[in-house]
Amino acid sequence: MKMKKMHLIINGVQRILVVDPDKSLASVLREQLLLTGCKVGCEAGQCGACTIVLNGKAVRSCILKMSRVPDFSVIETIEGIGTPDDLHPLQVAWMAHGCAQCGFCSPGFIMSAKVLLEENPDPTREEIRRWFQVHRNLCRCTGYKPLVDAVIDAAKVMRGELKKEDLLFEPKDNKIIGTTYARPS
């Protein structure tokens, strides 16, 4: 097994890694860097749970071998787009629309939608559906309406038409029962 030294920028941090060129990008992210938000469902590029952003493009990392990742690539994963105190508009919209029933597909959908909104800041419902079809993002729990609704609302936030707070539930009596915890990836 011949190892390969790579320079990558992952979630804004420059990294020097020694990788097996035959390993998938998903394996390297999950096993070497412990970025487990990149989910591996099918290992065949069919479900989209492993979608990350590579040099500005949504890619299915479970089928991308490290030998095909260019040196000095810029990689974004779900861990790099928001913080517990400052979530990305897509993450807020995902919560607001109840998009994460089991949550397994959410990181892949969010990363895919992030690229969509960078390329098209005002997509139609049909453009969003088509994007998810072309990029093979699948969800077996929610159906797709809440996912499309979330992308529409996140786009409004990113265009400045809404604030993130506008998407969140406000109880009428100003009381929420229970405790809020940051959800791990």
Model-derived regions: residue spans:
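Signature of N-terminal electron-transfer/Fe-S-associated modules in redox systems
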Residues: 1-185
